[in-house]
Every structure is written in C-alpha cells, then in structure tokens.
Amino acid sequence: MAELNVEIVSEERSIWSGAASAVSARTVNGEIGILPGHTPMLAVLGDGEVVVRTTDGGTVTAQAHGGFFSVDHDRVVIAATSARLGDAAAA
C-alpha cells in the first residue's frame, strides 16, 4: 500500500514526522487534501489545523500558523512559522 512520508516542522523545532495515508491542511486558498500519488505542489499555509491520518489508523493533529506546504514524490513537508501538536479544542 502506498504511503506518504510526512514532516511537520516549525521555525523552532521538528513537531512530528512519520508515515501517513492522508494529510489535510488549510492553505490561503482553502482546504487541501493529499493522498499518495498526488502531483507535486507548493502552497502557502494558512492558519489552522493540520490533520494526518497515520498508516496504523491513528490521527495526528497540529495547529499551524503561516509557512509553506509542499508535496513531492509522496513526501509532504509542512514548514510552519509556528506549530504545536493538538487540536484547537485542546487549547
């Protein structure tokens, strides 16, 4: 089964990395969803929740603010100005 190699980083540190089956995030142009095999792209990250569906069936959420979202050959890098694990309801 194809998978994504995902990395979420902020200016200060690495937030999370691992294998995923899907990733969704907010860009300045709206929500985007990424599955394995997605075409390469680069987007400006908006403020909001990043949701990673891990290959073991779990979910990782992070709050991200500003930065970039890139996809290339099943590698997803979310380079946020600031980010932290957890959803908005936990804040």
Curated annotation (Swiss-Prot):
Matching Gene3D superfamilies: F0F1 ATP synthase delta/epsilon subunit, N-terminal (2.60.15.10)
Membrane topology designation: Peripheral membrane protein
Disulfide bonds: none
Location(s), subcellular: Cell membrane
A Gene Ontology cellular-component term: proton-transporting ATP synthase complex
Keywords per UniProt: ATP synthesis, Cell membrane, CF(1), Hydrogen ion transport, Ion transport, Membrane, Transport
Example of a GO MF term: ATP binding
Record keyword Membrane present: yes
InterPro entries recorded: ATP_synth_F1_dsu/esu (IPR001469), ATP_synth_F1_dsu/esu_N (IPR020546), ATPsynth_dsu/esu_N (IPR036771)
Protein's job: Produces ATP from ADP in the presence of a proton gradient across the membrane.
Self-association and partners: F-type ATPases have 2 components, CF(1) - the catalytic core - and CF(0) - the membrane proton channel. CF(1) has five subunits: alpha(3), beta(3), gamma(1), delta(1), epsilon(1). CF(0) has three main subunits: a, b and c.
NCBIfam families, alphabetized: PRK13442.1
Similarity section: Belongs to the ATPase epsilon chain family.
Protein name as catalogued: ATP synthase epsilon chain
